Each structure stands twice: as structure tokens, then as C-alpha cells.
Amino acid sequence: MKVLEDYRSLVHGIGSLDFSGDAVPCKLLLTGDTAFPVLVTPRKDVLIAASRYGKGKVVVMAHESYLNTNAFMDFLKNAVSWLSPNSEANIGVHKGLNLLTDNLSANGSKVQNTSTLIEGLGVFCTIGYDDSQDKQIISFVREGGGLLIGAQAWHWSYSHKQENVLHHFPGNKIISVSGVHFTSDYGEKGNICVMENIPQAPIYTSFDFSLDQKYLLKGMSQLDISGSSIPSDLLLHGTLSFPVGLSENKQCFLGATYYGKGRVVVATHEGYLSKSELKTIMLNAISWLDINQNRRIGVHKGLRQFAELLQKENIPCNISSLDPDLSVYCCTSYSDAEAKAIHEFVAEGGGLLIAGHAWYWSSQNSDLDVLIQYPGNKILNKFGISILDRTIPGGNYNAINPDESSQQYHFRRGLCNLQAELRSGAEVKPPLSIWMNKLRQDVTAFMRLPANPIISSIQSQFVEMMQICEIPNVTKQCPVSSCSKEAFILCLAQECFNVCDESHILEKEPSITVEIDGTNPGNNAWRSTGLYLAPRKTAVLEFPASAVHQGLQVQVGCQSDDLSSADKYCRAPVVVRRFHVDSQRVSVSCFWGGLVYITVKANSNLGIIPVKVYEAEPAPIYIKGKTSLDTWIQSIRNLPAPWAELITENIILTVPSDAIRSLSDPEALLSLWDKIMVAITELAAIPKKLPRPERFVADVQISAGWMHAGYPIMCHLESAKELTDLNIMQTGGIWGPIHELGHNQQKTNWELPPHTTEATCNLWSVYVHETVLGIPRSQAHCCLQAETRANHIQEYLRNGSNIEQWNVWTALETYLQLQEGFGWEPFKQLFKDYQSMSGIRNENKSKMNLWAEKFSEAVQTNLVPFFEAWGWPIEEATHSKLSVLPVWEKDPMKSYLSARKSNSN
């Protein structure tokens, strides 16, 4: 690692450095992505730092007297050697640093005494109280020069109380471009040991941003981000970043930061820049960014509306790309073409207003990491801000109170507070307890940030912090609150044990070779390997070269529900991990363990892929028509892996292994499931072989309900028996599982949400129970008994056939009456016809009229009176079109309407 080599060059032969003299150092603040601490005190004060800028290097001392003190000379000689672009470089030394001059000269260096930067120098050694040459020194370093500088800012701050030390202190006007700052805080003194490896940087340094927030929020009591624009959330991970706009849940849609000599404001939707309700804050932002009020504003061509807004406010601006002569540049986050130039522009004093969201990019680039590869983050990560793929609900949010800035959520502050709480063992108290959910989300994102010395240091400190904690043993009987310290540990365990150690694995013979079907005409699909990876273990998978970079992923675990929004956890919220197959050898691990899958993206045509797998163990897997029943009974069902799979052509059941230990005839069970799935496809009018088999996965906790649809369909552990017990299925039925399979067949073109969301899926439940299981609808579910059905209809009519009350069983009744009158064939025909229809308006009234029309035509009967009895808003055009057909003489609603009319008389 290059930075470690740099560090060891600087401290070579140095055991300790004595800061116990009269000089009082200041703390140094590190913010840049190339800055690293060289000397850190026990109290975590940085007293020496180094960095790179452009082609050059910088070493910073926390007091100028250290440049002229015997105790530091060996270190300073190392520093000058490291800073020198070559061994023959001329060294310029400030005239007051005679001891340094003598020592460098005695060491064979070519030294010139000078109080200013002059031509021909390779290294310049100076003190940080004169900024008259700041631009020249910055240019000198950028082009490859070395800078050794010492100063402290605490004394200066006494006589400049109204000025911002980070921005106005002379030394900071020189070194801040490198991501190192002098501060007004006293540093710890003493004889400090030099570490063998780079010392850890402080996690958090407190700064008061209240004046900046007041400036930016002047004239704003609320921030209105309602409307169609959906913003992303921001991760403010830099020490000098701060929130400007927050939702009620502390999600940040507007943030700002200092970087080098410049400033940055980030909005997470470009539409906000020209949104009338936010005009005041955007104008404030332009003014805040334009540090010297030069009013040279450049606006990228993608933000023409914002340029027009500025011009209407008499703020001069031009449509342009980035120009170093601008004072403020405004652009979107959707391109990184100017990233390098933007970094230099801001570091050297420019202001950047950048806007855009990342959620759409992430949805279109699901195999890429938004934190690393999203264009905007290639610009912003360096500044200490990242745009996330998480969205924020629109709304009219109260402006934050700058006077309460010390109590505002800040990622680094929260992490520092958590460290103290974990060490103390005490219960988490406000405000940290209020921040825990947001902090957990931010830590998860932060741990994925690209490495640099400061980020890596904080990441490693977090890992150390977590590794001293005991992982809570949560169960359904012993859950933990989502806001608790235990929940935080549970959620982040994977991030802290994210180590794939393959060093010992490849010496062994391959344990198993599996063949994966890489052809997938359906949506993204999981292919079972039949293998299980134990918790905290590492497996290695070897793919043929033809399978690399084809969108394949290795997935460990199948309980894919994210429970992060739950109030309590019976398991960690995320227990599935995925790894891109971007090389022939892929190492995988998961803190929680799990079954191993290869995911094949939609419309892949890769054929059969042989995969060698090291260190995973066989799981109890039965494949209908392939697995020997004798082998199943004798050995497979007794394999120790905790999860089992039962696989047939159109469905895969994943259940606890304990649920199948006594299963002696999986062939008969799966034969029944085959019949069920054929019935599912029959009613849906789709081919009997699904392009992607359905999946059921049992879990101790799921994200919604007793079961929920999707891929996979998730259910509670208690449902495993319902899925795998042939007797239960044949005698009592399985309404719930078929209900979820029905959900997966609902289509937007004929669905009428929210009314039929929990209704039409039950058509499949009725169909399967009657045609496959031989269980009539009145026995399949208690709500379909004749008396209960009649009560649903009567109550609905009694309330005036209000379509707002047409839901679930009442809505299902409409479809059941049609089925009982005309059979299943019209449904099958319509479901088939709808598959080839286009241009259907996604609006319920229009879809109701279309269904009434199509069903009437399918059965050659005018069903308008029937649907109107149910309160459907049938239009005159539909009336007219269907009037040529005979009315439904056996309309079941007639008797209910007649009875109601008689009762009213």
C-alpha cells in the first residue's frame, strides 16, 4: 500500500517525538483523501500529518517551533527526503529556521535561506502565518514540489474571533488544498511514541456550522420538496460536511461541506434548483458558495432552467462547462467527465452546486455499487458527501434550527458517541438512541466507500469497536428492539466480519462440481447449487472464463427480506450476500451462512455452466425425477445443513431441514405440487413450464404479513409443514400458499388496486382447491361459506354499493358470481387476451369498463346491469356497445336487489 510506504519513509528510525516543551501545538484536522496522520497522541490529537496534492507532497507540523527544535531533526530530515522530487533538489528554508538549515546542510542537502518561495526549489520549508504567496505555493506543490510547513492557529483565533479559522487562517489558505487544516484547538503535549503502522485518525472532530446553516437557511422556515421529484438520501461522512435540509427521519436531501479552500452544496434532485418554493435557499447557496462574491457563475447546459432563474434575479451567469476562472460552477451529478477538474477547482477556492439523485441509476445498474461507480459519487466522495440509492419521501419539511446544531445528527458524531457507549456497556441514551436507525444505515453505506487513509482508518476502528461486542442471540422468543445497541450490533455484524480467507482452501481438491443452467428466458433467477456455506466460513467458486462478466452472481442465503424497517428483530435484517462473478475465481462468505446459489440475470443464454466449489457442504436437496428415493431416505435428508430444498419443474420449496427429516416420499409430494402449478398456469393462460420456477422460502421473520408474494414467496417457519405435508394439503387445503402464487399472476392491465389486490389472487386459490385438491370453495375458506357470502353482498348493498368499500371478499364475490354463472373458460380467455393488449390506461374506471366489455363479449351476454349493481362506474359508451347483447337472465344480483327493494318499501 503506497500510503504505508510513505508513512514508513517519514518515521524511519524514529521511536518517539517529544512534544513536552514550551510550545503549545494545535490539533490538525485531516479531510482530504490523500491525507494521513503521522503522529497521533493518546488523546487522538493529530500533531503531524502528511498528504499529496497534484504531483507534490506536503508535511504539516502543529507548531512552527518544531521546525527548529533538535528533538525533531531526524524526523525533519526524513520529511525533506520524502518531500524531495529528486535527490539533487534545492531546499528552500525560511530564514528563521537556522537549526533546520544547519542540519539539512550537514546532511548534504542543497539549502537556500529564503522567506519566500523562489524559482528552482524542489522543497520549501516555511511557517504558516503568511499567505501572501498562497497561490504560488499551491501551484508549486501541484506541479511536483514538496512543502514542509509548521504553525498553530489557536493564538491567531484569539484576535480573529469573528473569522472562520478553517478558511481565513493564513496557513490554511496554503495547506487546505491537501486536505490538512490547522485548528484553533490545543493539541495534547508529551513524549509521543511513533507507531509502526499509520496511527488511527480521530473519528470525529467537533465543528460549529450554525453560522453556515443560518446563512443558507435565511428566509426559510420550511423546505418544500413535495411533488413528483423523488430525491435520494445523502451520506454526510466528511468531518466538514453538514446538513441543510433534513426529513423527519433525518434523511438528508440538501447538504454542504468545506473542501480545501472551496465549498460544496449538494441537492439530491436537479429539479430542486429551479423549484419556486426553494428559490430562496438556492440563491442563498450561490451566495455562500461564492466566497469572494466575484459573481462569475457557470451553469452546465443540463440546468438551463436554473440559469434562467439566476438571470431573472440579476445574478450574472453563463451556460458553460467548468472554467477555472469561475467562482461558482453548477452542474448535475449524472456525469463524471469533469471530476478531476472539479476537484482541483473546489480545492483551490471554487464553489460547487451539484444536484441529482442516484436511485434511478442504481435501478438501471443493479450489478454496480452506487457508492463507487455512480458518476456523481466519483466527484463527491472526495468531498465527504455521497449520494445514496435510498429515496426520501416528498413533503414540506421544517427547516433545521441552526442554534441546535450541536444536537443534530452527524454521522461521525453518532459513530463517536456509539464507540463510547459500546465501551461503557451502558444502555444507549438520547440523542444516540434516536439516531440508531439512521446511523445503522449510514454505517452500512460507509463501510462500502472506496478506501483512502482516513476512511480506511475509521472503517478499521469501527470493525475493532464491533469485534469486542458479543453478537446477540436473537430468536422469535427473544427479539431485540430495532433502536437498541443489540440491534445495531446484529445489523452490522456482516460488515465487520467481511473477510474472505481463501489462503488454505485451494490446496485441497475440489469438493464438488455443480452444473448451472445459464439460460434464463424469464426474470432474474436463482439457480440452486445444492450446497450450504456455514457461518463465517469462506468458499471459493471457480467459473469457466466464458461465464465471467456475464451478469452472474454468487448468492449466499435465501431469506432475502430486508427487515430494516421492523420495530423488532428476530434475526439480522439482512442475511443474504451477493458477489459478482467478475473473475474466474470468486471467494464468498456470509456471517450468517446460508444455501449457495448462482443468480442468472434475465434473458441470459449461457447454456450449462460447470462450477467448481471448494469448502461448501451438501445440503438436503431433493430434485423430482433425479434424486434417488433410497439415497434420500438413507442419507440426503439427514445431512446436517440447516436448510433443505425440494425442487420440481415449476416450484422450489426451501424449508428448515428439520421439516423434512421424516419426509419419506418427496416424489408424491412434488407430484402434487406439479399438478398445482399446472393449474396455476392453466388459469393464468400461460405455458405450463414457467420461464422461472416459483420459490417458497421459510424464515423466522418476514417483512410483511403471514406470507407475502414475490420472488421468492416468503413465509414463516410454521408454514413449512403446510408446504411439505401431503396429508394436510389434500385434506385441509393450502389456501395461503396458493393465495400468494395467485398474487404473482395478477397483472396491471386487469387489476383494480387497491380494491382487488387481495381479491383476484384468490381466484387461483379457488381454482386449485376445486380442480386439483377436490375441496369445494365453501370448505376451502370459511369466508366462502354460503351464508357468509350472502352477508358480504347484503352489507355492501345496504351501504349503497359504495365502490370504496368493494374490497377483499366483497370484491372476490363479483368474480365468483361470474365464474359460477359462466365457468372458468371466460377467465382463461380474458387472461390470455389481456397478454397481447396494449395501450390500456392505468386508471381503474377505464379498466373496469374494459373488463365489463371484454367479459360480456366473451360470454355473449350484456353484463352492464350486473356490474352496475356492484357499483362499477360503467360509461355510456360501454352501455351502448353492449346493448346489442342479451342481458343476463340468471344475474345473481337481481334477487339481492329485489329483496332490498322490498325491505325498503
UniProtKB/Swiss-Prot annotation:
GO terms for molecular function: transmembrane transporter binding. GO terms for biological process: positive regulation of protein targeting to membrane. GO terms for cellular component: plasma membrane. InterPro entries: Class_I_gatase-like (IPR029062), M60-like_N (IPR035423), Pep_M60_3 (IPR042279), Peptidase_M60_dom (IPR031161), TCAF (IPR051244). May play a role in the regulation of the cation channel TRPM8 activity. Belongs to the TCAF family. PANTHER family: EXPERIMENTAL AUTOIMMUNE PROSTATITIS ANTIGEN 2-RELATED, TRPM8 CHANNEL-ASSOCIATED FACTOR HOMOLOG. This is TRPM8 channel-associated factor homolog. The lineage of its organism: Eukaryota, Metazoa, Chordata, Craniata, Vertebrata. The gene is tcaf.
